[in-house]
Regions:
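Hinge/lid segment of periplasmic solute-binding proteins
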Residues: 2-52, 194
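A ligand-binding cleft/hinge motif common to bilobed small-molecule-binding domains
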Residues: 6-10, 172-187
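Short glycine- and hydrophobic/aromatic-rich loop-to-beta-strand nucleating segment
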Residues: 53-57
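Alpha-to-beta junction loops
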Residues: 1, 162-170
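Extracytoplasmic/periplasmic substrate-recognition and gating elements
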Residues: 42, 65, 140, 183-198
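Bilobed periplasmic-binding protein-like "clamshell/Venus-flytrap" ligand-binding domains
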Residues: 44-45, 87-101
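Glycine-centered hinge/linker elements that transmit conformational signals in sensory
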Residues: 83-84, 119-150, 196
């Protein structure tokens, strides 16, 4: 479901190029085919929807903490500070300031938003500051531990819907999930979205 995963499948020869299969004009993909084209001139996937990542936040938790909502211009430093400020409690009542799902992209995406870096070329040192931040947040109890998330199979939607975290970075597809959840939820809460931190 992400570029490194696709790249690995291509390298293992599990995916075949679609260049000869998709012979119609691809102009209506608005440049996405070009973005999906690999160094060898082939493309192995076609876009099926257009999603983007945003930062979801629980307005009620922010109100309760007396903390201003996230802005549309959060730097990574602002985001980290806000997550730390929003972390409270312990045990079953702990609220984590932020949450990262177990997908690679939940952490690595922060590193490529500036458009200056790519994960295609195999050089990943530019991701170190992001991973250092996430690992520090785990050690400090600001976000749930990756190992715990993997072994418990806790889904990002459950963490956010159960109000276990104040913020979660996730794709726009989560909007419809949240709306559906809120229709029948016993405990409803107010939530919002802002642009991804940079």
């Amino acid at each position: 479901k992400d570029i490194p995963g696709y790249a690995n499948l291509i390298n293992l020869d599990y995916l075949k190029p679609l260049n000869e299969v998709l012979t119609r004009d691809t102009g209506d993909f608005n440049g996405t085919i070009e973005q999906l084209t690999t160094d060898d001139g082939n493309f192995y996937a076609v876009p099926f929807r257009s999603d983007f990542w945003v930062l979801y936040y629980n307005k009620d938790l922010f109100d309760k903490a007396g903390v201003e909502y996230p802005s549309n211009d959060l730097t990574m430093e602002d985001y980290d500070a806000l997550a730390r400020k929003m972390t409270s409690g312990s045990g079953d009542t702990k609220v984590y300031g932020c949450h990262y799902h177990t997908w690679r992209s939940a952490a690595s995406l922060f590193s490529i938003l500036d458009g200056k870096n790519t994960i295609i070329d195999g050089k990943y040192d530019f991701m170190k500051p992001t991973y250092d931040m996430v690992i520090a947040q785990q050690k400090d109890g600001i976000c749930m531990d990756y190992g715990y998330l993997k072994t418990s199979s806790l889904h990002y939607s459950a963490a956010f819907e159960n109000q276990q975290c104040a913020m979660v970075n996730m794709g726009s597809w989560f909007i419809s999930t949240l709306e559906a959840y809120m229709k029948d939820a016993e405990t409803k809460f107010n939530w919002g979205i802002v642009k991804y931190p940079h």
